[in-house]
UniProtKB/Swiss-Prot annotation:
UniProt-annotated stretches for the region Adenylation (A) domain: 256-653
InterPro entries assigned: AA_adenyl_dom (IPR010071), ACP-like_sf (IPR036736), AMP-bd_C_sf (IPR045851), AMP-dep_synth/lig_dom (IPR000873), CAT-like_dom_sf (IPR023213), Condensatn (IPR001242), PKS_PP-bd (IPR020806), PP-bd_ACP (IPR009081)
Protein name: D-lysergyl-peptide-synthetase subunit 2
Keyword Iron-sulfur applies: no
Pathway the protein contributes to: Alkaloid biosynthesis; ergot alkaloid biosynthesis
Coiled-coil ranges (or none): none
Keywords, in A-Z order: Ligase, Phosphopantetheine, Phosphoprotein, Transferase
Domain Carrier: 793-869
Source organism per UniProt: Claviceps purpurea (strain 20.1)
Lineage of the organism: Eukaryota, Fungi, Dikarya, Ascomycota, Pezizomycotina
Family matches, as SMART domains: PKS_PP
Length: 1303
């Protein structure tokens, strides 16, 4: 007699095999049973004859037949179930493994003894398998077969009734087979909560078909057909009608709206709007430019844009030219973008102004769309013959290509035609109820085809495409959706989970796709808006199955109503249809099926197949069918349930990933790897989000374990210890992967293996790897991270608040999160970062997703995050920051400004920065004056714009400030009650420059040759941090928002209370003897930075993450300069933001807070990088209270301090948030203006570190530094940055040696 332990041992390699429920169990009867009966077609004699000829018992034939049925309905190749013994009515387990290399006769032979051992060894009385018996059979399976019952073995009616009762108490489905000369039948008894009667009848008939196929002598399982004639007839009725091909053109349909509603808004973007008239004219301009460059049918044109209204213009322009477009995401690695452009032999790239440099590296020619120059060029075509309706591209021509993850290691391009897109259009428009009142929010990345549907379908319907900025899309999604008055939103269920339907009163329809959605996640939506769930693939023009989710009771149902046809076939043989309810591969037929894969005939022929024979019998004519690779089941009510992927392709947060491609790049990144597996790991209890993990067996870790050991592996035997050597390599490996793959395809964890586990058939046991990895705790996984930290509890209220935020969004307990823990190491990702930012904002913290990426450690994030300031805070009262008589101060200010006393609003001292800048202006009237052209949208309201500028000036006194000199108080700022001077003149250059005592800000409107607005502004009233804020406020004021009052007086009050800086600067400069770099021709030479060089290098995520990017760059330049000078004690100038000052609301004040200070770094060749980083950051942090003193004051603190201020290299780290905070409407590129205004030294370095890219712009004096020298310096800076990021334990001397070896 067997024991429960013996059963567990016998079935340990098998996952539970449960017959699936076909019903939504809510309200279903799960206790009562029903039965159906099917008579066998083959008489008793044929079954017995087959049994005798093959030397197997009839029971074995029936067991294998039931195993085949289970395989079909569960999708599992390893099946197990219970068998009621004929002799003693005990229950024994039966296990059968079906593999493609096994024939039926082999399987029958292996099952001749049901357990492969002595009969009865695994028998257990039914009473022992109940809850009372302490052992549940449902632990392994939920079905049982009882038979054959023949001759004297037939039980009495009483015995049969008792056995049936016992079996039904244990199992959900019992198949009883009675075989005799007089009666041969199958009785299938099932729980009513499992299936309906017609479904049970289909299962019983599938059992009958399986028996029939076995005794007919078929050997290959992929030749077995379990389909009944009833199922075939039903499927044929469902799929009788195919959608027709359309000869219409998308551009024509959109053009109709351009004629009917020219003034209606077609695109509403964060960067401005386009009417349908503008959409037509501008896209036609793009068309003409592209035609002249040879673009036409079957020519693929990459489009590279950040989120922008101009991307829609580019798409439509390519379509009008007859070409096919490919949307690229600039956030993807340049190497991946280049491989896509090479794949399509791109002649040119259509790009935004911001992405032009990146685009230049992808193709030989770049066409700029957007920006003043490009817009003016397109405007030249307005009024020309609009031949956009000329028939250029035929319906079969390519409309677009989408590149998805490919198993060969390179992206594969899916090509869709005009006709396939148009075939999906009618049903899509109807399902989403899109019309000319729809406002569709374009959330998806440009790398995914959903964004194409969001744009083109909306325009075909006459609606408005709403385009958020990248920053709002990630950091403030709720506000962005509200801002646009969104009616339709397409997101993944993961994103929908972080949104609240109550926040969107205008929303009518939400579309969920890209991944499975759980019913409980949809409940909050179905009672507020229409919920559409999309199932589809890029190969089928986005959508092949769609459903409308109605009441909560029906949200599990998915109906395909797209005009195409769906079939379910044997995954190993598409010539065999599956029964209704059985698991099989989904085939899609119809006009929505795409053309195939670009330049990949082999992959295309495997996936886009000719119609199978059974389909050709149904309808005449050939058609292409798409093999989806998805395993699904279709029930008798036409509902579809996704089961899993057939291949190694997975979806993570809605993004399709081919595991083979990731494995390919992991092998390239780890040359020592002998075997590599990448899996999507899902925790059983959902305590952490799904993540990609890479399992690597390398020469260094591999053991000499036997095959037997690899088949019986445990977690202790499989996973290697995370050595220090391994952790030191993780950063480099991850950096290589990020260079080659989008971030969502980079594994979160890389696990080294001792052995690669095998299945019993000696294949890699992916399932076991997944199970073992899922069982690892967060603490276990952290051991495999590159950086190890010890637990430190939060030390202040802000850290405690962020500990709670981390815990809520990551699903962790508080005691699992320390102050030094890394958000992404704990399991965070871009989507949970969005949730974190939203949660923090609700708690009145000023946090963005970019902040989370910049400072992922909890303590760092808390330190860099401020509470939103209280709007009721009092600022210093007017005239209180200058001692003396108010009347006298006002009278002197009015006299010098030549204004009446009544308009003087306040007077306070200048900052040291302002004093220095004004001193330079007195010598050179043009010094530190920026001239910025503000591009004006075509439909700008100039009166409204002028009032918007006035509102910005009223809210920010710094823009109404003049500078005067007082003999008693020195340089003073005078705030006056006036608007910014608005001058209308066609001669911009001849306008009087700003001067002392005069306004420091001017606006000049030019009417000819074209309308343009110019901003002249002195650096004394702005800096690189405040200028984007100013344009953002201008946009808000133009759109009617009220601006908060932000005087500079609070910052001036802080400066007046600064501690004495003498000790700090004297200590920092003491003993400095190194010469400045570069050397000037003579001491009185004034550098003139007339040359420019740029350099960009990809750097890995820093391993010493406790140090800021600014600290890393300072050290990188110090090493570069030390190498060039041959010295270890170097100094240069650096610009600090000044925004670390403890002043409320300083982050939103339009005041120049930057300060220039000397930076001295002494290197030690025997010290590791981390030690020097710590020293640099410590010195900088201690210097925050003293950074506003000014260079003039520092130089008066002694000879050494004066020498430190004689630097000739200035390093400025640009804030990564500047670009993201650019305004929505008046978008202007101010970077060059900023560079020129700051560039007064021999070398001026402007650095930006973002998304692992270090970008450096150098303005330098070409008479002092040669072009070759400057290029070498920039390359060495990039190399040093890479070394510092990748290996903080590396010695400084080793980096200097590596630079020397490059010479």
């Amino acid at each position: 007699m067997a024991t429960p332990e013996k059963w567990r041992k016998y079935l340990e390699d098998y996952i539970p095999c449960s017959f699936p429920t076909f019903l939504d169990n809510e309200g279903a009867d799960s206790k009562s049973f029903a039965s159906v009966l099917v008579r066998l077609e083959h008489p008793y004699g044929r079954l017995m004859s087959f049994s005798n000829n093959c030397g197997v018992d009839v029971a074995v034939v029936l067991n294998v037949a039931w195993g085949i049925v289970l395989q079909a309905y569960t999708g599992q190749d390893a099946t197990c179930f219970a068998v009621i013994a004929e002799s003693n009515l005990n229950i024994r387990p039966c296990r059968i493994r079906f593999t493609s290399d096994k024939v039926v006769s082999d399987i029958l032979s292996a099952c001749q003894s049901p357990c492969g051992e002595k009969t009865g060894d695994h028998d257990i009385p039914a009473s022992h398998l109940s809850q009372d018996g302490g052992f549940l059979a449902s632990e392994f399976f939920n079905t049982c077969i009882w038979g054959p019952m023949q001759g004297s073995q037939m039980p009495s009616e009483t015995q049969a009734a008792d056995m049936n009762r016992n079996a039904l108490n244990l199992f959900d489905l019992v198949t009883r087979v009675e075989v005799d000369k007089s009666i041969t039948r199958i009785t299938l008894t099932y729980k009513r909560g499992l299936m309906r009667e017609h479904q049970a009848l289909a299962v019983a008939k599938a059992m009958e078909r399986a028996i029939s196929e076995i005794i007919s002598g078929k050997e290959r399982l992929d030749q077995f057909c379990l389909l009944t004639s009833e199922d075939r007839r039903q499927m044929s009725l469902w799929n009788m009608n195919l959608s027709d091909n359309s000869d219409a053109r998308i551009e024509t349909l959109i053009h109709e709206w351009c004629r009917w509603t020219p003034s209606a808004v077609a695109v509403c973007g964060w960067d401005g709007d386009f009417s349908y008239k503008e959409l037509n004219e501008l896209s036609t301009g793009v068309k003409h430019d592209l035609r002249h460059l040879g673009i036409g049918p079957e020519v693929f044109v990459p489009i590279l844009f950040e989120k922008s209204r101009w991307a829609v213009i580019a798409m439509l322009g390519v379509m009008k030219a007859g070409g096919a477009f490919i949307l690229l995401d600039p956030a993807h690695p340049p190497k991946r973008l280049r491989s896509i452009c090479d794949k399509v032999s791109a002649r040119l790239v259509v790009s935004s102004v911001q992405q032009a440099d990146l685009a230049a590296g992808l193709a030989g020619h770049v066409v700029i769309v957007g920006g003043e120059v490009a817009t003016a060029g397109m405007a030249q075509h307005v009024g020309e013959h609009d031949d956009s309706m000329d028939c250029i591209a035929a319906p079969h021509n390519a409309l677009y290509a989408v590149f998805t993850s490919g198993s060969t290691g390179t992206p594969k391009g899916v090509v869709n035609s005009h006709s396939s897109f148009l075939a999906a259009m009618p049903v899509y428009l109807k399902a989403l109820e899109l019309d000319n009142n729809s406002r569709v929010f374009q959330f998806a990345s440009y790398a995914f085809d959903v964004t194409i549907f969001d744009a083109l379908m909306t325009l075909v319907a006459g609606g408005c495409v709403c385009v958020p900025s990248n920053a709002d899309r990630s950091s403030d999604l709720t506000s962005a959706i509200q801002h646009f008055g969104t009616t339709h939103l397409s997101v993944t269920p993961t994103v929908a989970r972080i949104l609240d339907p109550q926040d969107f009163p205008s929303l009518k329809t939400i579309v969920l796709g890209g991944e499975l959605s759980a019913s409980d996640e949809l409940l909050k939506w179905v009672n507020n808006v229409r919920v559409i769930r999309l199932y589809g693939a890029s190969e089928c023009t986005v959508m092949s199955i769609q459903c409308t989710s109605g009441p909560a009771s029906s949200i599990k149902t998915i109906n395909y109503e797209t005009g195409n046809c769906c079939w379910v076939v044997n995954p190993q043989n598409h010539e065999q249809l599956r029964p209704l309810g059985a698991v099989g591969e989904l085939l899609v037929e119809g006009a929505v099926v795409g053309r195939g894969y670009l330049d990949d005939a082999s992959q295309t022929s495997e996936t886009f197949i000719e119609a199978p024979a059974w389909l050709q019998e149904l309808r005449q004519g050939s058609s292409t069918v798409y093999k989806s690779g998805d395993l699904v089941r279709i029930a008798a009510d036409k509902s579809v349930q996704f089961v899993c992927r057939k291949s190694t392709q997975v979806k993570l947060r809605g993004q399709r990933i081919e595991l083979g491609e990731v494995e390919h790049h992991v092998r390239l990144a780890i040359p020592s790897a002998t075997e590599c597996v990448v899996e999507l790991i899902t925790n059983p209890d959902a305590s952490r989000p799904p993540m990609l993990m890479a399992f690597v067996l390398s020469d260094t870790d591999a053991s000499t374990s036997s095959i037997t050991a690899r088949r019986n592996a445990t977690s202790d035997a499989v996973f290697a210890e995370p050595s220090a050597s391994f952790r030191s390599q993780i950063a480099s490996i991850t950096s290589k992967l990020r260079d080659a793959l989008p971030s969502y395809m980079v594994p979160s964890v890389i696990l080294p293996l001792r052995i690669m586990p095998l299945t019993s058939t000696d294949k890699i046991n992916r399932k076991l790897l997944g199970q073992l990895a899922a069982a690892l705790s967060r603490e276990d996984l952290q051991l495999y991270q590159a950086q190890q930290t010890t637990y430190r509890a939060p030390s202040n209220d802000i850290e405690e608040a962020f500990q709670r935020f981390f815990a809520q969004v990551l699903g962790l307990s508080l005691d699992q999160i320390g102050a030094d823990d890394h958000f992404f190491s704990l399991g965070g990702d871009s989507l949970t970062a969005m949730r974190l930012a939203a949660m923090a904002r609700k708690a009145k913290f000023d946090l963005t997703v970019q902040n989370v990426f910049d400072h992922p450690e909890l303590s760092e994030l808390a330190r860099h995050t401020k509470l939103v300031a209280d709007e009721s805070q009092e600022f210093p009262p007017p005239f209180t920051l200058v001692a003396g008589s108010k009347q006298g101060i006002v009278r002197d200010a009015a006299r010098q400004c030549r204004l009446p006393s009544r308009v003087i609003e306040d007077v306070y001292p200048c900052t040291p920065l302002q004093k220095g800048l004004l001193a330079e202006t007195m010598r050179d009237a043009a010094a530190f004056v920026a001239k910025i052209e503000v591009p004006l949208p075509r439909d700008v309201d100039l009166d409204r714009l002028r009032h918007a500028w006035a509102a910005v000036a009223k809210a920010n006194p710094i823009l109404r400030t003049r500078m005067i000199f007082s003999p008693s108080y020195g340089m003073l700022q005078v705030v006056v009650r006036e608007d910014i001077p608005w001058i209308e003149s066609d001669d911009v250059e001849s306008q009087e420059l700003v001067a002392v005592g005069r306004s420091l800000v001017q606006l000049i409107l030019r009417r000819r040759p074209s309308t343009a607005l110019f901003l002249h502004i002195h650096h004394a009233v702005y800096d690189g941090y405040s200028l984007p804020l100013m344009f953002a406020q201008l946009n808000n004021a133009y759109h009617g928002e009220t601006l908060a009052f932000r005087p500079a007086s609070a910052f001036i009050r802080y400066l007046a209370t600064m501690p004495d800086a003498t000790d700090y600067w004297q200590s920092m400069c003491q003993g400095l003897e190194s010469p400045s770099f570069p050397a000037l021709p003579h001491s009185s030479h004034r550098p003139h930075p007339d040359s420019k060089a740029t350099h960009t290098v990809c750097v890995a995520s820093p391993q010493a993450r406790e140090y800021t990017p600014n600290t890393h760059v300072r050290l990188a330049w110090a090493i570069t300069q030390a190498h060039e000078q041959g010295l270890l004690d170097v100094f240069y100038g650096t610009v600090v933001s000044g925004r670390n000052a403890p002043v409320d609301q300083i982050e939103s004040m339009l005041i120049p807070t930057v300060a220039t200070v000397p930076c001295r770094i002494s290197l030690d060749v025997d010290s590791p990088v981390r030690k020097i980083l710590h020293r640099i950051q410590d010195v900088a942090t201690r210097g925050i209270p003293f950074e506003q003193i000014g260079l003039a004051e520092i130089s008066h603190l002694g000879k050494d301090a004066a020498h430190a201020c004689s630097f000739q290299t200035l390093l400025l780290m640009q804030p990564t948030a500047v670009e993201q905070n650019e305004n929505d409407f008046f978008n202007t590129s101010t970077s060059d203006a900023n560079y020129r205004a700051d560039a007064t030294y021999a070398i001026n370095l402007f650095c930006t570190l973002e998304n692992q890219d270090l970008s450096v712009t150098a303005l330098y004096d070409g008479n002092i530094v040669s072009t070759d020298t400057m290029q070498r310096l920039l390359q060495n800076l990039g190399k040093s940055m890479q070394e510092i990021h990748a290996a903080p334990r590396t010695l400084i001397g080793d980096i200097l040696k590596s630079l020397h070896s490059r010479l």
